[in-house]
From Swiss-Prot:
Name of protein: Uncharacterized protein MG342
GO molecular function, one term: FMN binding
Lineage, highest ranks first: Bacteria, Bacillati, Mycoplasmatota, Mycoplasmoidales, Mycoplasmoidaceae
Coiled coil region boundaries: none
Keyword Nucleotide-binding attached: yes
């Protein structure tokens, strides 16, 4: 499969029983694509001092893996209106990778941002809007967002998977 056809799902939850992980796994099987768990790339919290002395190899590896794809699907829970702190930290580190230019590690890539939440209030919408701006700043061409709200047991993800397919 050429880069032009490759999609990658980035799971931004570190919760073992994440409803977003259920959605990401269904997406993975439906799209026949790779899924990367950001929790497998956890590193110390970013600081300028740490960057100057010890840029994490894990982050360089992750950025290289991302750059092998043309379409990214971010699947995230909502934590107080934004993504989980550990995921924000990993993205912060990736923006500092000099190989692709500061804040440009997503340049030339297309993306879809998804959030699954049991709530019906505005937290999910807020995280999608903020992550859209945050990732666009790093060069991502955000094709759209998919909000799955009102999640409950035995939920049918199929209509939302179809939305993602139309966007990538």
């Amino acid at each position: 499969m050429s880069k032009d056809q490759k999609s990658l799902i980035l799971m931004l939850s570190n919760s073992q029983h994440s409803i977003n992980r259920k959605f990401a796994n269904e997406l993975k099987h439906s799209l026949s694509c790779e899924l990367i768990e950001l929790k497998d790339y956890q590193v110390d919290f970013y600081s300028v001092d740490l960057e100057a002395t010890n840029f994490p190899d894990k982050i360089k590896t992750l950025v290289r893996k991302i750059k092998e794809h043309s379409n990214l699907i971010f699947v995230t829970p909502e934590h107080n209106g934004f993504i989980p702190a550990f995921a924000k930290n990993i993205i912060d580190w990736m923006t500092r990778d000099e190989q692709y230019g500061r804040n440009q590690f997503l340049k030339g890539l297309n993306g879809v941002i998804c959030c699954v939440t049991p709530a019906t209030a505005g937290g999910g919408k807020t995280v999608l809007e903020l992550l859209d701006k945050f990732l666009s700043f790093s060069g991502l061409n955000v094709k759209g967002t998919v909000l799955v709200n009102g999640y409950h047991e035995n939920f049918d993800f199929k209509p939302f998977i179809e939305q993602v397919k139309k966007l990538i």
